[in-house]
Amino acid sequence: PGTNFPIELIYVKKHLVIEVVDAFDNWYKVLDEEGNTGWLHKSLVSSRRYFVVKNDSAKLYKNPKNNIELLFLETGLRGKIESCRNDWCKVKIKKYSGWLQKIDIWGVYQNENF
C-alpha cells in the first residue's frame, strides 16, 4: 500500500460498507460488499458501523422480541448499525429506527455483539 501505486477503484457511495481484512502502517486492506479488495488510508475509514441489506425478504422490526414489522426493506438499502446482540442488530435508516436480523444484512459478523 502507498501513494506510489495506481488507483484501481474510486468509491463515491456515502457510508460504504467495508470489512477490514488486513492492516499495514496507516493503511487498511478492505473488502467491499461486491467482493472488491484494495487498500485505503486509515484517515478514510470511520469506526461507525453501517450495513447494506442483502435479502429481499428483510424486514425492520419494532424490537426483536415481537413480530411487529415496521418496514419491508429492499436489497441494497443502507443504514447505520447502532448495536448488535445475538441474531439481531438495532439500526437506523434515515428517520426510522428498529431491529434487523443479522442474516439479512452485510456489514456485521454473525457472532459479533457490540
Predicted regions and their residues:
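Boundary regions of SH3-family modules and the immediately adjacent low-complexity/disordered segments
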Residues: P1-D25, L31-I68, F72, R78-K80, ...
